Amino acid sequence: MVRVTSVGCFLLVIVSLNLVVLTNACIPEGSSCSSSGSCCHKSCCRWTCNQPCLIPGKRAKLLEFFRQR
């Protein structure tokens, strides 16, 4: 009787661990996202998982302006 109970507990632990892994799955880098919490690196930038989140500054905007002329 003890052996059956321990096998049942062991199987229950395996099933519960599989459920935890499935619910904690994160979105890999480069995939589309809606919030930072769903990305693996916790960085959702412009609806894409990126690490780090790069936002162009004044210099990048100025260079883009001169390229258009």
Curated annotation (Swiss-Prot):
Keywords from the named record: Amidation, Cleavage on pair of basic residues, Disulfide bond, Gamma-carboxyglutamic acid, Secreted, Signal, Toxin
Entry-linked Pfam families: Conotoxin_I2 (PF17557)
Tissue expression per record: Expressed by the venom duct.
GO CC terms, sorted: extracellular region
Location of 4-carboxyglutamate modifications: 29
Modified residues (Proline amide): 56
PROSITE patterns tied to this protein: I_CONOTOXIN
Signal peptide boundaries: 1-25
Post-translational modification: Contains 4 disulfide bonds.
Protein's cellular compartments: Secreted
Similarity remark: Belongs to the conotoxin I2 superfamily.
Domain notes from UniProt: The cysteine framework is XI (C-C-CC-CC-C-C).
The protein's name: Conotoxin Gla-TxXI
Organism: Conus textile
